[in-house]
Amino acid sequence: MSALFTTRRAMLKGAVGLGGLAAIPAWARAMLHGPIRQGFDEVSGRVIDLAVGQGAIEVAGRSGHAFAVNGSVPGPLVRLKEGEAVTLRVANHLAQDTSIHWHGLLLPFQFDGVPGVSFPGIKPGETFVYELPALRQSGTYWWHSHSNLQEQAGHYGPIIIDPAGPDPVQADRDYVLLLSEFSPLHPHTIMAKLKKGEEYFNRQKTSWTDDYRLSGSDRRMWAGMRMMPTDIADVTGSTYTYLINGHAPEDSLEYLFSPGERVRLRIINGSAMSFFNIRIPGVRMSVVQADGKNVRPIEVDEFQIGTAETYDIVVEPTTEAHTIVAEAMDRSGMAVATLASRAGARAPVPSLRDPVLLTMTDMGHGGMDHSGGDHSNMGHAPSTGGMDHGSMKMRDTSSLPPNVAVGPGIDMVSANPADRMGDPGLGLDNVGHKVLTYRDLTALEPNDDPRKPSRHMQIHLTGNMERYMWSFDGRKFNAVADQPIRFAYNERVRVKLVNDTMMAHPIHLHGHFFELVNGADRMHQPQKHTVIVQPGGSATFDLTADEPGDWAFHCHLLYHMHAGMFQIVTVASPDGEA
């Protein structure tokens, strides 16, 4: 039996990496008993100490519960160096288990930080020591808890890995923008409300008397499906305050620059449930990195960032101040900061745009929506013209492959799941300026593996929105926990993700990067660790399974993952052990 998998079994019994709290310095322990700070410090070095605590926090005049690492929300910026090893000692001062997952990092699976998959978790009063060997990458990443719903309540922070050699991205200033949310509700309360009624937080519900331009037949169609065309996000600005680096819009967060400078902004979506549309009115953005991987620079005016994605951009501000806008995809709120040439300089903050409405394309009928008009920016949906929606058989499961379990966990099937890699994201298809799509991304350097895939597989993203059930292939994780998706070591696989739901899902694979099949030549397909699969559509990636071990594979919408949209991927060791 390989030593690798012997280690895995020992880890899950809690036998490796645990120590006492004595290793944590007094300053870290003391911070847990003081007020929780908003914003973060930077930690670096060959040995880094992180202490997980909890307490009360106040955001925009509302109080709530928070998990704080080293006394702050977000937790500290962990700054590392490509080619160097690092030891991270994480002490748990909570009364419950905790963990840290190093999102996007290539490392031995024993230190990936997913309880029950790669290690047993960190018990109250214990310390876990993450031993990361020489880092094989550079770029912008982040870390977060993978225990319970702690991530929602502040247990997250940024990572920067500086390159060993010259950085191809040249800038005069370098800033982190970590996007997240705050709610005064406890995360388990939010989950309970979603289980009782998926539309609980949808404050933009349509009715027969509202001003959304829906025909009577369209309204009857949506009512018959027990759905709403405004059902864009499960949790919205009705409870969330949207944050940048832990700060609400009224905190007036600013990033200083001098005229003529190039400013690098490392944008991390560390939210639990929110997609954001990023723009800086009056300033074009050059996208230079996606999920920590350098891409050929592409100039855009706006881009959508899904939960768990990262994008690095370079901007050249031209006036005294510019507003950085991170508008929630459903347009129920925004996070705001300012690029300022002097302290206190401000630019106008744009109003929220009209709400987005779902369309026939989002229902998996991509070839049937020929309106061609702007049905998003103006808050209008194209009329379906009295189509026979019954004939579309949106709930007809006969077209599903045999590996998909049909049952109450599936309330929709995409009849025509078109490849939506060229879509800019819900609400951005006709906004009158350049919006980034996955098809715009091209790897800056050639990919390492020139082989064509030797195997093709398809995974369906499934759910029942009304009952708040989410899964892969119709099976929640508790039904397949002992049936991982298996890959041979170094196997080259093409994976097609088919979204049989009306929600966008950010799908994340731990421990690997995959290449988006986005129209670029095979050697320059962009590498990512997280991909958005648009409603009713599909997305495809190529994977080289060269990181042995057990890895989490899941939707990064926290409550979807918690409800069952989670699987384990097992990559065999080089000697064939699995």
Where are these regions (language model features)?
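Histidine-centered copper-binding motifs that mark active-site loops
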Residues: 2-6, 13-307, 313-314, 344-392, ...
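Predominantly extracellular/luminal regions of secreted and cell-surface proteins
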Residues: 51-52, 212-225, 440-466
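N-terminal pre-domain segments of enzymes
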Residues: 31-44, 48, 399-419, 435
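Eukaryote-biased detector of low-complexity, proline/serine/threonine-rich segments
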Residues: 310, 314-321, 537, 544-549
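Hydrophobic, well-ordered secondary-structure elements that form the walls
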Residues: 50, 459, 495, 507-510, ...
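Terminal connector regions
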Residues: 149-152, 321-349, 556-564
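C-terminal substrate/ligand-recognition segments
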Residues: 457-459, 463-468, 482-514
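C-terminal soluble interaction/assembly domains
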Residues: 516-546, 552, 561, 570
